[in-house]
Every structure is written in C-alpha cells, then in structure tokens.
C-alpha cells in the first residue's frame, strides 16, 4: 500500500483565510474560525499546511466538474481540441461555451477557476503567516514556509497559464493587511504589472528550502519538483504567445534546469528520473510504475479512503465515467475528439501525419450498417482497425472494437457513449480506474471515476520534450530529435494484443448472440515495430511506430516533430491548449480544428479569436474592482 497524504475535510474546513463558495477571493480576510493558539505547535501548523496541499486536488474547492483543478482538462484538453465536452448538449452550458469557443468573461467555469486559484493562494499565505508568527514554537518554520511557497508558486503559475501574466499576486503582506479594494494588476500609470518574477522567486525559495526526498510522505514538495516547475515557468516566460505576455529570454535558464533534472534528478522515493518501460503503466493504479516509479516529476498524490466523499478523482471530477460500461452509472463527459484520434494515424515509416494530412482523413470510427447472422441490418459504430496508428492511442482513448481496460469490448453505444451526436464516438480512458481496482483498495464501489492513481502534472517524458524545445531554440536540431526519439521509442513497448483480452472478447460473443466470433475478434492485425525492427502478430489494431531521422534536421522538421510528440505523449493530460497558446499558433490550429470537427457537428462551434492566448479575467472581478483590476490584453 503506498504512503499518501490524507486530504482531510477537517483540514479544509479550518484553513485560515479560506473563503466560502461565491465569495470574492481577492478580498483578503486573514481571520478564521480557528484560534492561533490551536495552531501554535507542530501538529497545528502541519494541519494548516495539509489544507494548502489539499487545494491541489479537492473537489470541495474545484467544483464537482473539476473546472478549477490543476488537471485543467476543461481548458488544456477541451479548449485544446483534444476532447469534446461529452454528455448531452444542454448539460453544463458554461462548459459548452468553452468547448465551442462561444464564452465570455461572465462564464461560470472561468469565475470558478479564478476563485479556486486565489482560494488556494490564500491557504498558502495563511500557512506562511502563521509559521512566521510561531517560528519559535515549531520545529522547522523554514521547511513549512518553503512548502507553502512551492504550492503558492504552482497556483500562481496556473493563474499565468490561464489568465495571463498580468494578474494580482497576493503575497503574505497583502494577505495579512486584509486590504480592500482588491490587489491591483496595474501600476499608477495604468501599465500592467507582470508577475513572472514573483512566481520565479517562490520557486527559487522553495528550491533552497526543500529536501530532495521525504521519508514516506511522497506527496510533499521536493526541491526537484520546484526545479521542474521553475524550468517550465522559464519555458513559458520565453515563449512568444502573441506578444502580449511580456515574454523575455529565459531559454538558457530553462535549458540548464531541465538538463540538471535529466542528469541528476530523482523522484520522491529517491528513484533517478527515467522513462518507465510501458506507457500504459503510468495509468494503471496496480502497477508499481504508476506513481513514483521514476517518471513522476511533479505529481499530486491520491488516496483511497473507502467512500465516495473521502476519495479523489485524478482529474477532479466524478462526471468523466462512462454511462454504465464499468458496472455503475456515469455521466459520459470528456470524450476525445475526432481530430485528436486522427492525429495518431501514422505513415509508412511509423511517423505521425501532418495536421493537414490527418484532417484530410475520414474519422476512424463511423456508423455502419452491418448484417447479423439472421440477415437483419443494424447500424453500429465501427472502427477501421486496419489503419495503422501509434499504440498510445488505445491507452489514451477508448475505441469501439478495442478492449477498454477490464470493462469489456465496446460494440454498441449503450453503456459507452451517452450521445454521439454531441460528443462523438470515443471515450476518455487514461485516468479511469479498472473494475478490479474496486476490490483491491485502489478505487471505490460508489463511483466510476475515483482512483488512487496520481495526477501527473509533470512527467519525465514532458521534461525530455521541454528540454528538446530548448535545444531547438539553440539551433541544435539533431540533438533535440534524439530526446524526442527517446519518448517516441518507448511507445513501441506497449500495445493491445487479442490474447491478453480473450475473456473480454468471449464475454462479448456470449452477449451478442446475433454475431459470430469473426464479427467481434479482429484478425490479421500486427504491431509494426520499426524501433526494434520486429513485427508482432495478433494485435487488437494495426499499430506502427518509427523514429524521426536523426540527421539533417531543420528548425521546421524538429519543431513539427516536437509538437506532434507532445500531443501524442501528453494527450488528455491537460496540456495542449496551453502549448498552442504559448507557441502563438492557437487561432490557426483551433480554427482548422473547428473546420474539421465541425463537419461532424454542424453549427456547433464558433470561431476562435485570433488573439486569444488566455482566458478573460472574470467580469465580476473587474466590476468589483472598480478600475483596480484591468481586463487582460486579449479581452480589452
């Protein structure tokens, strides 16, 4: 059983400075319901610190739809063209607005995200403030403060990613003063105040004050986690966006930190950072490699405590479960897009098609009229499993005709897709628990999504790809491809084989009595492994993986490889929209996506704004601030 940090409801309820849902989270209030005397010891301050850690994955804070969580599936995936909202059209209309690019600054999810960030920041400031006040009464105030600054840095970096770098930074002095009006994001001349350097300092302080590992408390912050967050901050700070994020040249600092992490870094258990052997084990709670097996760089630790209310879902929402396939109900949100799935189609060399080529293809899954053994026609979702794809697709997305964890083999819509006319014909997969997890203490029998698998915020594969991006900036294109190929090569190790899921196929044959085994079990399919120069027969789909050429690369070829690899490797992990925005290509890419995906969902999408590289600051905050908080440049 893995050691976990328990995110107790009591810690949440007693955190100083925590506001209730619907409050103005920038109206600072350092007073709380617990006296200083109660917290003026090691147990009390750690209790308070636990409340700050809990902000990193708490559905109490983030709303049961997870719109404020660090998983960022709503923004990184759904706004980033990797996922549709799912469910039905009239469910969660604020979510629909984000999915279809028809939102504005009054959107409830956007307000919830803003409030969630600043609630978490207030929790961190409560810890720092109290630790300073009782420094002489606790064992190690500096260690407590370093952890709180790390968490505050994580959340303020999340604020930058979502709302831009000109947002209020709430430090402990502002928190203690309880000032009203709000903390401003502009100076006296009306110029934006960019907070990059303030978040940078939080991570630097955390690096200086945190240990490399902990003895058992694996979810606590370490200096290596802080280094990874700082390196990623430098990468974003250096990225072009659309010229309105006060970007600066920190490529060298990012590069050096990433190289240090690659060469010397170790995870919370002291394991040197590495790519684990099998990609799918990253999302298999029963695998020792799932969490802290060497690939976890920045994880949010999960725990199972036996009931729905005491248990977290890695993406902070209970709504992403399939509607019945796991043996219990589900809402059917968060479905991979046709565009995303097509991006896994590969060419004869096992390399991804260009975006233009992939969008020229039809969907891999379509409705087909099939004739059963009684001679009766029936319309069913059918996937063309002969088209060669990157095997990471079937670990990331559920496809009809391919085994889905231990749930079964999807054959018809019932139990799998709630409304394919709204969300498409694919299912999310990575962060769902298996049915077997319920009996092994890794999930619960009361909810289809809750799981003990960690939320991976930064994996070692991500570090390798971000380092490659720095090398591309330095003009070292062939060297960058070497790191990209490390990530791509691992994909050849893990794929679906028919014999491994014989029981699931047999169950489907027994239940679908009007169809023969030949209608259900694929045959003649292979894994064409060009990485290791071998072919494996008996696979559930045609798979193919090859490596990028290692010589003669240009900025264009290396950049294309990097961007394709980030989408494939990190798909459905909350990254893609942020990548598109910082690269300055969001409008072009997403309007192309609207054109392609919109063919299958007529009149669903609006166009994506040409300057949108961030969300608007919520209208309510602008209104309450009365000029103190100014709307960001994208949304003026």
State each model region's role:
Residues 4, 8, 14-43, 199, ...:
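Bacterial Sec-dependent N-terminal signal peptides
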Residues 21-74, 368-373, 385-387, 618-636:
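Membrane-proximal, proline-rich intrinsically disordered regions
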Residues 21-22, 45, 61, 78, ...:
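Long, intrinsically disordered, low-complexity segments
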Residues 41-50, 54-59, 86-163, 184-218, ...:
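Conserved, well-structured interaction surfaces
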Residues 160-162, 167, 236-245, 475:
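Short coil/turn linking the two alpha-helices of tandem helical-hairpin repeats
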């Amino acid at each position: 059983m893995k050691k976990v940090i328990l995110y107790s409801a009591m810690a949440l309820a007693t955190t100083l400075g925590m506001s209730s849902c619907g409050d103005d989270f920038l109206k600072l209030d350092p007073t709380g319901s617990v006296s200083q005397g109660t917290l003026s010891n090691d147990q009390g301050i750690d209790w308070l610190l636990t409340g700050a850690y809990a902000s990193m994955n708490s559905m109490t804070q983030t709303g049961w739809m997870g719109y404020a969580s660090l998983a960022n599936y709503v923004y990184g995936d759904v706004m980033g063209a990797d996922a549709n909202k799912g469910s039905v059209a009239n469910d969660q209309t604020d979510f629909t607005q984000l999915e279809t690019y028809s939102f504005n600054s009054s959107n409830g999810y956007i307000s919830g995200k803003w409030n969630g960030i600043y609630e978490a920041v207030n929790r961190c400031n409560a810890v720092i403030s109290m630790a300073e006040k009782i420094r002489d009464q606790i064992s190690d105030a500096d260690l407590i403060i370093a952890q709180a600054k790390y968490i505050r840095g994580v959340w303020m970096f999340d604020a930058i990613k979502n709302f831009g770098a000109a947002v209020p930074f709430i430090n402990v002095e502002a928190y203690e003063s309880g000032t009203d009006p709000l903390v401003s994001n502009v100076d006296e001349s009306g110029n934006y105040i960019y907070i990059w350097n303030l978040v940078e300092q939080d991570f630097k302080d955390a690096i200086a004050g945190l240990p490399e590992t902990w003895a058992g408390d694996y979810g606590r912050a370490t200096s290596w986690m802080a280094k990874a967050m700082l390196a990623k901050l430098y990468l974003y700070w250096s990225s072009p966006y659309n010229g309105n994020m006060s970007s600066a040249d920190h490529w060298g600092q990012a590069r050096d930190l990433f190289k240090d992490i690659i060469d010397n870094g170790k995870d919370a258990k002291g394991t040197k950072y590495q790519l684990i052997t099998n990609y799918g084990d990253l999302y298999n709670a029963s695998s020792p490699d799932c969490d802290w097996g060497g690939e976890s760089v920045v994880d949010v630790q999960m725990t199972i405590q036996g009931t729905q209310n005491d248990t977290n879902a890695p993406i902070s929402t209970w709504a992403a479960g399939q509607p019945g396939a796991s043996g219990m109900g589900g809402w059917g949100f968060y479905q991979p897009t046709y565009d995303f799935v097509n991006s896994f189609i590969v060419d004869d060399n096992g390399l991804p098609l260009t975006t233009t080529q992939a969008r020229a293809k039809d969907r891999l899954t379509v409705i087909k009229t099939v004739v059963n053994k009684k001679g009766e026609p029936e319309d069913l979702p059918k996937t063309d499993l002969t088209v060669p794809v990157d095997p990471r697709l079937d670990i990331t997305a559920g496809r009809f005709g391919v085994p889905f964890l231990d749930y079964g083999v999807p054959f018809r819509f019932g139990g799998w897709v709630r409304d394919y006319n709204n969300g498409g014909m694919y299912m999310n997969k990575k962060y769902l628990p298996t049915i077997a997890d319920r009996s092994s203490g890794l999930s619960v029998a009361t909810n289809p999504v809750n799981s003990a698998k960690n939320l991976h915020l930064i994996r070692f594969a991500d570090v390798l790809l971000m380092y490659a991006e720095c090398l591309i900036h330095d003009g070292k294109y062939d060297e960058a491809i070497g790191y990209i190929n490390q990530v791509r090569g691992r994909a050849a190790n893990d794929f679906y084989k028919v014999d491994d899921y014989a029981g699931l196929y047999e169950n489907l044959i027994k239940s679908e009595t009007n169809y023969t085994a030949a209608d259900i079990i694929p045959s003649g399919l292979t894994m064409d492994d060009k990485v290791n120069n071998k072919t494996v027969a008996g696979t559930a789909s045609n798979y193919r993986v090859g490596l990028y050429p290692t010589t003669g690369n240009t900025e264009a070829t290396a950049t294309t490889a990097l961007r394709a690899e980030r989408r494939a490797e990190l798909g459905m992990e909350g990254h893609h929209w942020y990548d598109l925005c910082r690269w300055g290509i969001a409008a072009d890419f997403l309007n192309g996506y609207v054109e392609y995906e919109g063919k299958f969902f007529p009149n669903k999408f609006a166009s994506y704004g040409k300057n949108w590289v961030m969300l608007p600051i919520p209208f309510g905050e602008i209104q309450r601030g009365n000029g103190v908080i100014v709307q960001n440049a994208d949304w003026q």
